[in-house]
């Protein structure tokens, strides 16, 4: 007989109240649910009178099986109990299902209440659903255009580019996904414009008083708390630091003035001015005479100062970038647009519904909406459906309650009888990870904090973990104590969320040490990452493979709970868990090479696969061959095998114009390459003619036949899967045309929209070795599962924040818009507010996702990350956790860029982790550094030095070849158009003279189709070093960015500046020997910089800007001369004089001293376009003064060069 804990017994036996069970990972919540159901049945309650809602169909099936087993076990004890026998038969037809299945039952039973045809079918084909939605959107677009509706045109103009209407369409489609989870979507939509209602006095508006003001007050008070906690350090009373303290006193006084202006409702412009005054008066220098303690405290004060400045800059950028009059104008424009959007969204919902009804279809969102309407509709029989279910169900049990949305919450409330406390909810706020499905964890939190305060409700916390060894639970607790707090995640993990070790059945001699493996990315990989994005580093996969091999070789023992015996580790005991599935194919490839069995439970990232990118690029070419990026991608693909030297040869012959023209020109050359070009162009032209008279599906199949593409991909690794993927695209094209759609361009746009909206069309991965292989899955797919050994990979991956960088943000409360003005775009205050709130919500969910991943481990947890600049990261982490509270400050958490930003600070606390390097590193011949950390129980800690193992480095050339062949995050994924956003650092090379630029030296970034070229010849002082020229150049910029022109005008000052940057973690200490201090000192002592010393307050450095530039100035293949691109960049510096602004930019380009004049002239031409961009931007953002001079600071040549 199972022995339950006190809290589990409460969850099983307590009745008469609405009960919320907060069940941590591995706490046996399913067991408790099943036991509670059995107790109800044994007390005479039929299973048909219970409603049990699960999150997935698989969970519902498991629940039914476990209930049947429990009843069967009881029947063995009471063989004559006929009631139990009848209940055993009733379980299969009982209401144990997902919320969708329950809603479907409501609709089938009471369809007549909403006048629905009972012969409806459920629309399960996602592609068909998307196509119907596309048709609905297309029809309402036609309706607006036929009416020549100017408001609608203004809406489309604001959110779409000059070439298409995708921006506006995406807004409407994404808004649809949100509103259909609202219980009253019309009310939700009608309320959206209200956020923008404002009079001329912004401070009096509801938006300011109820939304922005409370947020800003909270943020400022959080900053004040950080300062106050820092000054609790007794060391701050040290006489050494008196000037530091005085500097902070001035700053805190200014911060208090800003807070008072906020709280006292000063005018917007006064509050803005007060914020602009919130800055530190001086840059206090340290002294070598200070004690070691004072120097350490000083460094901490400098880091805090930097953080405070950064946070205030964000507040300014979000809420005070323009003055009140302009803010009000933006809000009024936004309100008008939102009203148009609301009108269009209502039409879209209505028309989409009509199209479904015409085919007698309902989709999943209809199920919940229709069920809610049925349950709340006042018919002649007065809520007949609602009363039926209220009388039918004695109790409503809900699993995974943390993941319900607003509509589901209202459905549950509708079937709960008033005055009857019969609601039983089980969930864990720490495992709410479905925000993309509109899950509302705040609904769980509101009950969590309210239940138990009266006699009608009860809160039960299940914290005992029966899944994991003590080492695993200690690891998880140690890592999450600093992360999840009341102001981040809604729960104080240290007090209320910790796992309690309950799995006492494990033998004490099992190997259970948690491990953390760093692979230190080499600096030389930086340029590669620019091309291929933030994908998983190969070394991570190799580390995991090596560790798995070692575990097998050393006969690692696992505890088998079925046999209650130890046994050797099997591959199927191991799970590799990642945040996304984008790296699946790469992992599969490496495992295949290592001859290790691997089963992938998630479908791969379909749209990013090599074969899909290849065929989509070919379709883009057939639609329009005048596109350089897809053209080069197809030429380089295995279909045609053009090599880079061949492409360069083609470009050299025709240096101007697009690449298609160059290819056409070269086809006339009498050579093997000319014939190769001719053959390609003939096939392309033949396919274009074929496309004009045939269906899209026929075109796709014709490409397969003419290029033998199916045969080619079948011969590649994982070839059968690739073939299935290509056949799937053919099937989708057939479905597209069957739905009445036509046109190749439209089909490409449809597929692209599905890709961006993550509507993956992937086919299940083919495998027959699931039971004998290592499992690879995403964290989402792993939820609810457990494995003896778990590797959590990709912890260095950057979080995706694209949703916050677009032109609109949809939140649970509103719709934030970016407004297009004549020469720029600007976020409305509603957009800025939504971005701030959504960013924190996103990061809170990322922390919860991390928790889910780590708690899958039963016996051994291994965390894996590849990290660049490891030493600098470690130095940064050392001081991040507040030493008094042992909490990671909120400011750090809301600025987290990756999981490592959450975990690193705690991992760096050496008193909790035993840091060793073991002999596993001998199996890794291709790594440079490995940080291998074992978790140690507090009482077992011994001080040990961290060891580092320098081994042979992977050949960069071979690495590039392998990655090019098997990199499935294809570098030309967005081939039909460039991004609407470019950085100056990326486009500056476009201004180069074509004679100076060979195609073979050009690169294109996959994420946004941006131009990049490698740095030109390296200056003398940068040569033959560990770091690349670009990296050293960046470091030189960094020193000049922070150089203090109020200090001593000596070389010692420069040394102190560099030392301070290292101590702040801004500059890698290994970089220091490679800096050209002579060049740096030349500039700061130069005649040009003399005025900086006299008037340092007039010097502005690292000034960011955004500016609209004609796309045709940057890209040859932009046929639309009116097309514009938003360019974002950072100006190295400018200086204010009485006459105007002096603009300057540092360059570390090599200058050939033997031909200095010609070399400087070449560099000048190279960067003239860039500086003109800067000039344009600076003139736009400067109200009173214009640029009167532009200069290049050539550090290698020690020259200041004027630019026209």
From Swiss-Prot:
ATP binds at residues 23-30. GO terms for cellular component: cytosol; DNA helicase complex. It comes from the Bacteria. Its cofactor is Mg(2+). Keywords: ATP-binding, DNA damage, DNA repair, DNA-binding, Exonuclease, Helicase, Hydrolase, Isomerase, Nuclease, Nucleotide-binding. GO terms for biological process: double-strand break repair via homologous recombination. InterPro entries: AddA (IPR014152), DNA_helicase_UvrD-like_C (IPR014017), DNA_helicase_UvrD/REP (IPR000212), P-loop_NTPase (IPR027417), PDDEXK-like_dom_sf (IPR011604), PDDEXK_AddAB-type (IPR038726), Restrct_endonuc-II-like (IPR011335), UvrD-like_ATP-bd (IPR014016). Residues 496-784 form the UvrD-like helicase C-terminal domain. Its EC number is 3.1.-.-, 5.6.2.4. GO terms for molecular function: 3'-5' DNA helicase activity; 3'-5' exonuclease activity; ATP binding; ATP hydrolysis activity; double-stranded DNA binding. Residues 2-469 form the UvrD-like helicase ATP-binding domain. It catalyses: Couples ATP hydrolysis with the unwinding of duplex DNA by translocating in the 3'-5' direction; ATP + H2O = ADP + phosphate + H(+). Pfam families: PDDEXK_1, UvrD-helicase, UvrD_C. Belongs to the helicase family. AddA subfamily. The heterodimer acts as both an ATP-dependent DNA helicase and an ATP-dependent, dual-direction single-stranded exonuclease. Recognizes the chi site generating a DNA molecule suitable for the initiation of homologous recombination. The AddA nuclease domain is required for chi fragment generation; this subunit has the helicase and 3' -> 5' nuclease activities. Heterodimer of AddA and AddB/RexB. PANTHER family: ATP-DEPENDENT HELICASE_NUCLEASE SUBUNIT A (PTHR11070:SF48), UVRD / RECB / PCRA DNA HELICASE FAMILY MEMBER (PTHR11070). This is ATP-dependent helicase/nuclease subunit A. The gene is addA.
């Amino acid at each position: 007989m199972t022995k339950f804990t006190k809290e589990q017994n409460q969850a099983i036996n307590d009745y008469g109240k609405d009960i919320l069970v907060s069940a941590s990972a591995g706490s046996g919540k399913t067991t408790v649910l099943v036991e509670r159901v059995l107790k109800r049945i044994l007390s005479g309650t039929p299973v048909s009178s219970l409603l049990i809602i699960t999150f997935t169909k698989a969970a519902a099936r498991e629940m039914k099986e476990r209930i049947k087993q429990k009843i069967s076990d009881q029947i063995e004890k009471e063989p004559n109990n006929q009631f139990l026998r009848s209940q055993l038969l009733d379980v299969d037809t009982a209401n144990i299902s997902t919320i969708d299945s329950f809603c479907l039952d409501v609709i089938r039973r009471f369809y007549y209440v909403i006048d629905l045809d009972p012969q409806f079918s459920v629309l399960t084909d996602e592609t068909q659903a998307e196509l119907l939605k596309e048709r609905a959107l297309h029809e309402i677009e036609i309706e607006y255009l036929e009416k020549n509706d100017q408001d609608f045109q203004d809406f489309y103009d604001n959110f779409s580019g000059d070439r298409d209407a995708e921006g506006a369409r995406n807004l409407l489609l994404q808004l649809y996904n949100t509103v259909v989870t609202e219980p009253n979507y019309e009310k939700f939509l009608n309320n959206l414009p209200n956020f923008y209602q404002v009079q001329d006095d912004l401070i009096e508006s509801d938006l300011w008083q109820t939304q922005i003001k409370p947020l800003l007050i909270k943020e400022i008070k959080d900053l004040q708390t950080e300062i106050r906690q820092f000054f609790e350090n007794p060391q701050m009373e040290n006489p050494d630091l008196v000037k530091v303290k005085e500097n902070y006193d001035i700053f805190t006084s200014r911060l208090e003035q800003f807070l008072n202006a906020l709280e006292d409702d000063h005018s917007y412009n006064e509050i803005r001015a007060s914020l602009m005054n919130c800055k530190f008066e001086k840059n206090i220098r340290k002294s070598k005479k200070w004690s070691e303690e004072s120097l350490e405290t000083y460094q901490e004060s400098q880091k805090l100062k930097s953080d405070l400045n950064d946070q205030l800059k964000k507040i300014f950028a979000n809420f005070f970038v323009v003055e009140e009059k302009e803010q009000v104008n933006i809000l009024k424009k936004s309100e008008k647009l939102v009203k148009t959007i609301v009108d269009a969204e209502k039409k879209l919902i209505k028309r989409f519904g009509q199209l479904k009804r015409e085919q007698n279809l309902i989709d999943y969102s209809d199920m919940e909406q229709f069920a809610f309407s049925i349950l709340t509709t006042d018919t002649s029989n007065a809520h007949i459906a609602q009363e039926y279910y209220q009388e039918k169900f004695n109790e409503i049990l809900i699993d995974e309650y943390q993941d319900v949305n607003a509509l589901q919450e209202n459905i549950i409330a509708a079937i709960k009888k008033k005055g009857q406390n019969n609601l039983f909810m089980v969930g864990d706020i720490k495992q709410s990870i479905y925000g993309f499905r509109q899950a509302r964890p705040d609904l769980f939190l509101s009950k969590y904090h309210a239940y138990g305060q009266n006699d009608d409700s009860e809160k039960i916390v299940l914290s005992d973990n029966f899944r994991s060894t003590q080492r695993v639970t200690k690891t998880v607790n140690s890592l999450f104590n600093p992360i999840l707090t009341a102001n981040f995640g809604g729960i104080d993990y240290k007090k209320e969320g910790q796992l309690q070790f309950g799995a006492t059945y494990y033998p004490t001699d099992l190997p259970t040490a948690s491990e953390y493996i760093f692979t230190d990315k080499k600096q030389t990989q930086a340029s590669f990452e620019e091309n291929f994005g933030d994908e998983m580093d190969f070394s991570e996969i190799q580390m995991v493979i090596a560790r798995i091999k070692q575990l097998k070789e050393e006969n690692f023992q696992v505890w088998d709970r079925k046999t209650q015996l130890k046994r050797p580790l099997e591959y199927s005991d191991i799970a590799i868990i990642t945040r996304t599935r984008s790296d699946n194919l790469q992992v599969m490839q490496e495992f295949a090479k290592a001859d290790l069995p691997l089963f992938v439970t998630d479908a791969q990232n379909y749209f990013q696969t090599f074969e899909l990118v290849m065929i989509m690029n070919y379709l883009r070419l057939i639609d329009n061959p005048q596109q350089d990026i897809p053209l080069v991608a197809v030429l380089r693909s295995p279909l045609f095998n053009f090599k880079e030297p061949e492409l360069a040869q083609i470009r050299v012959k025709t240096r101007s114009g697009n690449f298609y023209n160059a290819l056409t020109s070269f086809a006339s050359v009498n050579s093997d390459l000319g014939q190769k070009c001719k053959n390609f162009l003939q096939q392309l032209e033949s396919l274009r003619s074929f496309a004009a008279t045939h269906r899209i599906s026929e075109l796709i199949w014709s490409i397969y036949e003419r290029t033998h593409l199916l045969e080619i991909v079948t011969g590649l690794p994982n070839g059968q899967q690739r073939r299935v993927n290509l056949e799937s695209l053919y099937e989708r094209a057939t479905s597209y045309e069957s739905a009445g759609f036509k046109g190749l361009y439209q089909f490409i746009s449809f597929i692209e929209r599905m890709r961006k909206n993550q509507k993956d069309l992937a086919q299940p991965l083919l495998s027959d070795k699931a039971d004998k292989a290592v499992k690879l899955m995403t964290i989402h797919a792993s939820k609810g599962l457990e494995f003896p050994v778990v590797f959590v990979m990709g912890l260095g991956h950057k979080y995706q924040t694209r949703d916050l960088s677009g032109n609109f943000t949809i939140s649970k409360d509103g719709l934030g818009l970016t407004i297009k003005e004549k020469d720029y775009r600007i976020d409305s205050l509603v957009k800025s507010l939504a971005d701030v709130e959504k960013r924190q919500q996103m990061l809170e969910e990322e922390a919860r996702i991390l928790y889910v991943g780590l708690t899958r481990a039963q016996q051994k947890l291994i965390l894996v990350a590849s990290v660049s600049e490891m030493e600098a990261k470690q130095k940064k982490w050392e001081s991040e956790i507040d030493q008094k509270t042992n909490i990671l400050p909120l400011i750090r958490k809301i600025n987290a860029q990756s999981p490592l930003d959450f975990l690193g600070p705690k991992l760096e606390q050496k008193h909790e982790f035993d840091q060793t390097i073991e002999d596993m590193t001998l199996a890794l011949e291709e790594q440079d550094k490995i940080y291998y950390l074992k978790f140690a129980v507090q009482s077992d800690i011994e001080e040990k030095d961290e060891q580092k193992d320098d081994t042979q480095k992977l050949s960069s050339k071979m690495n590039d070849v392998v990655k090019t062949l098997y990199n499935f995050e294809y570098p030309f994924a967005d081939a039909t158009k460039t991004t609407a956003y470019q950085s100056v650092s990326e486009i500056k090379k476009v201004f180069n003279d074509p004679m100076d630029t060979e195609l073979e030296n050009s690169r294109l970034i996959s994420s946004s189709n941006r131009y990049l070229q490698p740095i030109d010849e390296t200056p003398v002082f940068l040569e033959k070093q560990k770091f690349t020229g670009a990296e050293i150049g960046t470091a030189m910029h960094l020193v000049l960015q922070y150089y203090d022109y109020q200090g001593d005008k000596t070389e010692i000052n420069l040394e102190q500046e560099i030392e301070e940057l290292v101590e702040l973690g801004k500059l890698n200490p290994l970089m220091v020997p490679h800096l050209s201090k002579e060049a740096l000192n030349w500039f700061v002592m130069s005649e040009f910089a003399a005025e900086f010393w006299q008037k340092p307050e007039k010097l502005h450095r690292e000034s960011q800007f955004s500016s609209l530039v004609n796309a045709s100035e940057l890209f040859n293949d932009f046929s639309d001369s009116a097309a514009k691109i938003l360019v974002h960049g950072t100006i190295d510096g400018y200086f204010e004089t009485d006459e105007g602004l002096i603009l300057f930019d540092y360059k570390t380009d090599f200058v050939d001293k033997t031909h200095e004049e010609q070399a400087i002239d070449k560099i000048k031409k190279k960067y003239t376009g860039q500086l003109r961009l800067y000039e344009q931007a600076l003139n736009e953002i400067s109200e009173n003064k214009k640029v009167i001079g532009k200069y290049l600071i050539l550090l290698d040549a020690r020259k200041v060069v004027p630019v026209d």
